[in-house]
Swiss-Prot record:
Belongs to the PNP/UDP phosphorylase family. It catalyses: a purine D-ribonucleoside + phosphate = a purine nucleobase + alpha-D-ribose 1-phosphate; a purine 2'-deoxy-D-ribonucleoside + phosphate = a purine nucleobase + 2-deoxy-alpha-D-ribose 1-phosphate. It comes from Brevibacillus brevis (strain 47 / JCM 6285 / NBRC 100599). The keyword Transferase applies. Its EC number is 2.4.2.1. This is Purine nucleoside phosphorylase DeoD-type.
Length: 235
């Protein structure tokens, strides 16, 4: 057991999906995994392990933001030996050619979080995805004719931002979308020499105000999960 995860050794698979919402973790386990069993409910942050196409896979809720995902990613890698971590979540687009319901695969993750600045003595570390996972996820998405974009995203510490000036600036530098966790996940995966990837569904467009309905989000979410699980089969 670790501080925030109540699993015993061996209960968590080497490959894990990481939604922010613990109820999404439960949904993934019940919908996509065979023989799924709950290994964690500490603080209500549910975790499950089952099989997908014969491969053992876990899914663990992480909560929202850099501090929360950092806790779970650290403990999963340090205490349970997890090797492959795939974040599955939502994001807000900031490019004109990206529409709601599109899928974004994060090649890298810029951030305003001070976590890496403190860690690297004020230099700008560039958190980057594992190429093998990224390449496989892109192949799977394109084979299924899903609208997918690959590029840099921005991990924000602020959900309710008063001004969009920063996001407009980031858009001019080809940043695709905004979310709140990936830079921390990629940094920790680099630290532990593990493999990480973020696959995100566009739930809204920050600059145009376009949004998806709950039903639309669920449909696209299912497609994204299948991409993540099939990409995970290579590891």
């Amino acid at each position: 057991m670790s501080i925030h995860i109540g699993a015993q050794q061996g209960q968590i698979a080497e490959t894990i999906l990481l939604p922010g919402d613990p109820l999404r973790a439960k949904y993934i386990a019940e919908t996509f995994l065979e023989g799924a069993e709950c290994y964690n409910n500490v603080r209500g942050m549910l975790g499950f392990t089952g099989t997908y196409k014969g491969k053992r896979v876990s899914v663990q809720g992480t909560g929202m933001g850099v501090p929360s995902i950092s806790i779970y990613a650290n403990e999963l890698m340090q205490s349970y030996g997890v090797q492959n971590l795939i974040r599955v979540g939502t994001c807000g687009a900031i490019q004109e050619d990206i529409k709601v319901r599109d899928v974004i695969i994060a090649m890298s993750a810029s951030s305003e979080s001070q976590t890496n600045r403190l860690l690297f003595d004020q230099i700008d570390f560039a958190p980057t995805a594992n190429f093998e996972l990224l390449h496989k996820a892109y192949q799977v998405a394109t084979e299924r004719n899903l609208p997918v974009k690959v590029g840099n995203i921005f991990t924000s510490d602020s959900f309710y931002r008063e001004s969009l000036d920063l996001y407009k600036k980031l858009a001019s530098y080809q940043v695709l979308a905004i979310e709140m966790e990936s830079s921390a996940l990629y940094t920790l995966a680099a630290k532990y020499k593990r493999n990480a990837l973020s696959i995100l569904t566009v739930s809204d467009h920050i600059l145009t105000g376009e949004e998806t309905s709950a039903d639309e989000r669920q449909s696209t979410f299912n497609e994204m999960i299948e991409v993540a699980l099939d990409a995970a089969l290579i590891k």
